[in-house]
Swiss-Prot record:
Belongs to the phytochrome family. This is Phytochrome C. Residues 620-690, 750-824 form the PAS domain. InterPro entries: GAF, GAF-like_dom_sf, HATPase_C_sf, His_kinase_dom, HisK_dim/P_dom, PAS, PAS-like_dom_sf, PAS_2. It holds the Pfam family PHY. The lineage of its organism: Eukaryota, Viridiplantae, Streptophyta, Embryophyta, Tracheophyta. Residues 904-1124 form the Histidine kinase domain. The keyword ATP-binding does not apply. The gene is PHYC.
Length: 1137
């Protein structure tokens, strides 16, 4: 399948490398960026931004111009004046380059008549160590030997002459080390420790807030982040920018001063942030401009250097002229920009070796802060913000993955339904039935051109125009199986301009040599919503020429003038899959011209599918039982009452309690007293469908194990469900933590004899390591050496994060930056004195084997109680436990397949119902007695009620009380008799009589409303009462109390009170709670009551449950307009049914 070129960007399937596609876009955009830069430099004040963006898209710079542009971006010769820069040789510390203001900032400039020595105090070749006091140059020397020097920033140093404090921020370049020096504000408490370990505290509250947010809400996540960054930094405006697939950007969240113009929803062209700048954001995650109007300071360097030094990673890099003008145009003087990076998309070329490669990173977006006056943020606070952005990146990763999974699930569901239609009516069915091809991917219209006939949906070109597109495809793209483009104009279709605003983008597939399916998209601008004042008048001398967010928006609209929203890879995969299905189900006319019939793909019968599903379920169940019994991890299970119904060999071995003796005992009787509440919590949560993770329980020991003390287990609770998804029990997959807790208890008792624990040679000792409060490794026990492959001498005195566990080729490599960020959060949380959660932590040992573990960390204290570091344990799950968890997932999938069978049964019930309706229609004209007609009428109402329930596919609308209610005229007594008929089988089986108590006028009462819903709720309440009533307790009474109200002169409202009374004690309280507060783990009866209560609420009514000393009652209050009310007055009657 071919794709047209739009902005030199190819649309391809996910099987192609996402990295390659991104590289292609970078290569395509960079000449445009260079062209814009050259035009700005050449025209300055007369630079017309909006028109230049459009021109740059049509023409690019020469190769030499691009090279000069990139060198200017990465090797600029100026820095901002709020600090000074020194570039040194990494071994001798000889000065290679320095900013002109360095001598003044370091107090090296003479105050009297200068001497030769003073003038040469700072020059190329100077030993930089002589500029600082002894402890400072020692710290700089030590940092220079470190592999990833960035992890040590900032380093507190003091100038030799004045003692003035600076933060030294170091990074490596091709010729040496760059040291950025930023003055420390005297009123700020300087950070005396190196690294991020202290900066974490500044952002701890914001990090905790981000981590507490629920998943699945990207908008909330971004809104909270901009507020937290605003509070941390104090900038006037904080915005979250997101880069879209085609590289253009959008403001998706904003927190600003009330008097500033909003930019929320603004889109801007890809060229607004050049690719070279994006590269710099990947190199230097935080970029601060203190004052865009300040005069930049020149860098002086050694003449022997062949090119200007790279300042990509410098915190002092001066803004380029065009960026400074952009800021000035929008009234901004200072800014702080932080990059948001996420894991790069992986190729779908199979899983082989995928675990052996660390994931790459890509720029997801930016966090941009602006201020209307000069503003300086100290480096520790910027570091804290960077750490916060790393946590945000982890959250974004989750959201991106969840969104992708949700989209794929939607497409798979739609494809399944479309396939079902194709089996009955291919290919027309996917246009004439619901869902249709427009549900497969987001589009504005679709068309099927099949056997010279046309079927259309939504906004499409005319029939003549579609035929012209078909002819164009056959002439110019005959060798491909289809085409996708976001711009028919740029794809070269000659009639694109004539299509107007209806169609800009198109995806087309061939289903035979002459037949096509089309998806159409309209203009991109239709999707754009900007919170700013894009329609406000612009200054007469501006007219969009000035660089400003408003002109960026105008430029963006110009760039996408002839373009639709791009087709995503997952969408093209779905379209291509449908094409394969269609081409397989239809015989191509060219292949067999004599046979124009459709070729139907034969599907296996439903019975065979059910049998196959049962066999699969049985196989999985048998395998799971075998694994549970033989697993080296303790596994136990209970039913909904909390009684043991599963107890594997390992659990019996640890506790000394044989399997046969454990079965049937309440779990709370087998745990020690302080675990009883934990077990009850787990069971209560499981009944609500909530599966608790990583909870600790202590089991009693018996027989030969009785003297060994309790068995301490870390358990994960898994809900066991039946075919109707009802929770029927809880399975506990556990890990024996007894040995670790013995060590922890010993560690707590001895309060400081950490070395005795770590060096204990016992095999029961788990992998243990210790760090100090600066993050350096102090101890590394034998078990850690075995599991990691790193010797103790190679780990001790190294930074845990950056030297021991790293994202580089040395140490124990982790998969991605997110893993290191999570580890850093854990360590910082412990050292700050908080109790952290356990961390699922994975890394590659020195042999390349991937190790998955659960990490526990606890604080270390000295004799005075001061926190001095952390003690950490690793718990590595056995292969059997991992296999058991995998089989559990397979079991859940099998249960889901069974649930699909229930959906099938629901579908098949509709045919017998239709047969019953047909039989009823035949009986209605027959000569029936009055009693027979009443019975037939009740039967009809039962059928209609069942049919309505079968159509309730959208339970959410019922829960939200906006489901549609029917409005028909009905007789109230007929509806009540139908309710009683539904309860009769259960009533006779339990020998419980049902009394009815209502006035005679009810038989004459004709109301207007949804009688079937009324029947449904009353029958459900009545069935629930029968379930919890015993024969000897007395009858159930259905009582109706009507009250009439006249509305005006021609309308009456019947206020009805239905009381369903049964003997005490009545329905269990837990079930009544489920009726009003539904949870995922609700019982079948609770779900029925909950739905009925919501239906009554939808009818503008209420439900109550009243408990009295001798009876309990459901009280339903509803009202209906009166359709016809007999004036005949009847005496009240009480009778049995």
């Amino acid at each position: 399948m071919s794709s047209s070129r739009s902005n030199n960007r190819a649309t391809c399937s996910r099987s192609s490398s996402a990295r390659s596609k991104h590289s292609a876009r970078v290569v395509a955009q960079t000449p445009m960026d260079a062209q814009l830069h050259a035009e700005f430099e050449g025209s300055q004040r007369h630079f017309d931004y909006s028109s230049s963006v459009g021109a740059a898209n049509r023409s690019g710079a020469t190769t030499s111009n691009v090279s000069a542009y990139l060198q200017n971006m990465q090797r600029g010769r100026f820095v901002q004046p709020f600090g000074c820069l020194l570039a040194v040789h990494p071994e001798t510390f000889a000065l290679l380059a320095y900013s002109e203001n360095a001598a003044e900032m370091l107090d090296l400039t003479p105050h009297a008549v200068p001497t030769i020595d003073q003038r040469e105090a700072l020059a190329v070749g100077t030993d930089v160590r002589t500029l600082f006091r002894s402890h400072s140059f020692v710290a700089l020397q030590k940092a220079a030997t470190f592999g990833d020097v960035n992890l040590l920033n900032p380093i507190l140093v003091h100038a030799r002459t004045s003692g003035k404090p600076f933060y030294a921020i170091m990074h490596r370049i091709d010729v040496g080390l760059v040291i950025d020096l930023e003055p420390v504000n005297p009123v700020d408490l300087p950070v005396t420790a190196t690294g991020a370990i202290k900066s974490y505290k500044l952002a701890a509250r914001a990090i905790a807030r981000l981590q507490s947010l629920p998943s699945g809400n990207l908008s909330l996540l971004c809104d909270v982040l901009v507020r937290e960054v605003s509070e941390l930094t104090g900038y006037d405006r904080v915005m979250a920018y997101k880069f879209h697939e085609d590289e253009h950007g959008e403001v998706i969240a904003e927190c600003k001063r009330s008097d500033l113009e909003p930019y929320l929803g603004l889109h801007y062209p890809a060229t607004d942030i050049p690719q070279a700048s994006r590269f710099l954001f990947m190199k230097n995650k935080v970029r601060m401009i203190c004052d865009c109007s300040a005069t930049p300071v020149k860098i002086i360097q050694d003449d022997s250097l062949t090119q200007p030094i790279s300042i990509c990673g410098s915190t002092l890099r001066a803004p380029h002229g065009c960026h400074a003008q952009y800021m000035a145009s929008m009234g901004s003087v200072a800014s702080l920009v932080m990059s948001v990076t996420i894991n790069e998309d992986e190729d779908d070329d199979g899983d082989t070796g995928s675990d052996q490669q660390p994931k790459g990173r890509k720029l997801w977006g930016l966090m941009v802060c602006h201020h209307t006056s000069p503003r300086f943020v100290p480096f520790p606070l910027r570091y804290a913000c960077e750490f916060l952005l790393q946590v945000f990146g982890i959250q974004i990763n989750k959201e991106v993955e969840l969104a992708a999974q949700a989209k794929e699930r939607h497409i798979l569901r739609t494809q399944t339904l479309l396939c079902d239609m194709l089996l009955r009516d291919a290919p027309v069915g996917i246009f004439t039935q619901s869902p249709n091809v427009m549900d497969l991917v987001k589009c504005d219209g679709a068309a099927l051109y099949y056997q010279n006939q046309l079927w259309v949906l939504g906004s499409t070109p005319s029939e003549a125009e579609i035929k012209n597109i078909v002819a164009w495809l056959q002439e110019y793209h005959d060798g491909s199986t289809g085409l996708s483009t976001d711009s028919l104009v740029e794809a070269g279709y000659p009639g694109a301009a004539a299509l107007g605003d209806v169609v800009y983008g198109m995806a087309a597939i061939k289903i035979s040599s002459k037949d096509f399916i089309f998806w159409f998209r309209s203009h991109t601008a239709k999707e754009i919503k900007w919170g700013g004042a894009k329609h406000e008048p612009i200054d007469a001398d501006d007219n969009g020429r000035k660089m400003h967010p408003r002109s960026s928006f105008k430029a963006f609209l110009e760039v996408v003038k002839w373009r639709s929203v791009p087709w995503e890879d997952v969408e093209m995969d779905a379209i291509h899959s449908l094409q394969l299905i269609l081409r397989g189900s239809l015989q191509d006319e060219d292949a067999n011209k004599n046979n124009n019939a459709k070729s139907i793909v034969t599907a296996p019968s439903d019975d065979m599918k059910k049998i196959q599903g049962l066999l699969e379920l049985r196989t999985v169940t048998n395998e799971m039982v075998r694994l549970i019994e033989t697993a080296t991890a303790p596994i136990l299970a209970v039913d909904i009452t909390g009684s043991i119904n599963g107890w594997n060999n390992k659990a019996a071995e640890l506790t000394g309690l044989p399997v046969m003796e454990a079965i049937g005992k309440p779990l709370v009787d087998l745990v020690i007293d302080d675990s009883v509440e934990v077990v009850k919590q787990i069971l209560n949560s499981a009944l609500q469908g909530i599966e608790e993770q990583n909870l600790q329980i202590k089991l009693k020991t018996f027989n030969h194990q009785e003297n060994n003390g309790p068995v301490i287990l870390m358990v994960n609770a898994c809900c066991s469900r039946d075919l109707s998804e009802k929770v029927v029990g809880v399975c506990f997959v556990a890990q024996d933590m007894t040995g670790q807790n013995i060590i922890m208890d010993k560690y707590t008792r001895i309060q400081g004899d950490y070395v005795a624990i770590v060096k204990n040679p016992s095999e029961l000792i788990p992998p243990i390591f210790m760090i100090n409060d600066l993050g350096s490794c102090l101890e590394w026990n034998e078990a850690m050496q075995k599991i990691t492959g790193i010797k103790r001498e190679d780990a001790v005195d190294k930074l845990l994060i950056g030297e021991v566990f790293t994202h580089h080729e040395y140490g124990c490599r982790v998969k991605d930056h997110g893993t290191l960020t999570k580890l850093s959060i854990l360590m910082n949380t412990v050292i700050s004195g908080q109790d952290p959660e356990k961390l699922l932590f994975g890394f590659f040992n020195t042999d390349g084997k991937y190790i998955e573990s659960l990490m526990t960390a606890t604080k270390r204290t000295d004799a005075e109680g001061k926190i001095t570091g952390a003690l950490c344990f690793l718990h590595v799950a056995s292969p059997e436990l991992q296999h058991a968890l995998q089989v559990q997932k397979m079991s859940e999938q099998a249960a889901m397949n069974s649930f699909k069978e229930l959906t099938y049964i629901r579908q098949e019930l509709r045919n017998p119902l239709n047969g019953m309706q047909f039989t009823r229609n035949l009986l209605e004209p027959s000569d029936l007695t009055e009693e027979q007609r009443k019975l037939l009428a009740s039967n009809v109402l039962c059928q209609e009620q069942l049919k309505k329930i079968l159509h309730d596919t959208d339970l959410e609308s019922i829960e939200q009380c906006y489901t549609e209610m029917s409005t028909v005229d009905f007789n109230l007594e007929e509806a009540l008799n139908t309710v009683l008929m539904q309860a009769m089988p259960q009533s006779k089986e339990k020998q419980i009589s049902i009394d009815r108590d209502w006035p005679a006028e009810v038989s004459c009462m004709h109301l207007c409303g949804d009688n079937l819903r009324l029947q449904q709720v009353l029958a459900d309440f009545l069935a629930c009462m029968l379930q919890f009533t015993q024969p000897a307790e007395g009858p159930i009474v259905l009582q109706v109390i009507p009250r009439m109200e006249n509305i005006g002169s021609g309308m009456q409202i019947a206020h009805l009170e239905f009381r369903l009374v049964h003997p005490a004690p009545g329905v269990p309280e837990a079930l009544i709670q489920e009726m009003f507060r539904h949870s995922p783990g609700a019982s079948r009866e609770g779900l029925g009551l909950y739905i009925s209560q919501k239906l009554v609420k939808t009818m503008s009514g209420t439900v109550q449950y009243l408990r009295e000393s001798e009876s309990s009652s459901f009280i339903v209050l509803v009202e209906f307009p009166v359709a016809q009310l007999s004036t005949k007055r009847c005496k009240a009657s009480t009778s049995k049914f």
